[in-house]
Design a protein with these regions (language model features):
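Hydrophobic anchor residue at the start of the ABC signature
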Residues: 30, 74
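Catalytic Walker B motif of ABC-type/P-loop ATPase nucleotide-binding domains
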Residues: 41-45
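Conserved catalytic loops of ABC-family nucleotide-binding domains
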Residues: 64-73, 81
Length: 130
C-alpha cells in the first residue's frame, strides 16, 4: 500500500505535498476528508488522477459512505455515478436532465449518449491493453 511503500506513518510530507504525485495527493486528501465525521460530503472529481484499481476502491468506499450519509458526487466519468439515487446531468451551466441511471438511459438524451460514448472508449482502451 501507499503508506507501507513510503515509510509508513512516519513519512514526511513536504510543503504543498511536493513529494507526492498527483494521484497520491488526491488519495491523501480524500482519505482525510472521508475520515471526518460529516453529514454531507461533496466530492468533486474524487477519482481524477487515480489509477483504475484505486478508483474502484475509492468508489466502493463512497458507496458505503452514501448508505449512511448524504454524498454529492461530481464526476465527468459517468460510470462512477451509475449507482446514484439521483443523477443531475449538466449542460451549458444548467441542469439538462435528472433521474436515475436507468431512466436517463431510457430517455436517450445527452446523458445516455455521453455514457454510451464513454463506455465504448473505455472498452476500446481495455481491448488495446490486452
Amino acid at each position: 500500500s501507499f503508506v507501507r511503500e513510503n515509510g509508513g506513518l512516519d513519512k514526511v510530507i513536504a510543503e504543498d505535498a511536493a513529494n507526492l504525485s498527483g494521484g497520491q495527493k488526491q488519495r491523501l486528501a480524500l482519505a482525510v476528508n472521508l475520515t471526518a465525521e460529516r453529514d454531507i460530503y461533496i466530492l468533486d472529481e474524487a477519482t481524477s488522477n487515480i489509477d483504475i484499481e484505486s478508483e474502484e476502491i475509492i468508489m466502493k468506499a463512497v458507496a458505503a459512505l452514501a448508505k449512511e450519509k448524504a454524498v454529492i458526487l461530481i464526476s465527468h466519468r459517468l460510470a462512477n455515478v451509475v449507482p446514484a439515487e439521483k443523477i443531475y446531468a449538466m449542460e451549458s451551466g444548467g441542469v439538462a436532465e435528472c433521474g436515475t441511471h436507468a431512466a436517463l438511459m431510457a430517455s436517450g438524451g445527452g446523458y445516455a449518449k455521453l455514457y454510451a460514448a464513454q463506455k465504448a472508449l473505455e472498452e476500446g482502451y481495455r481491448e488495446d491493453e490486452e
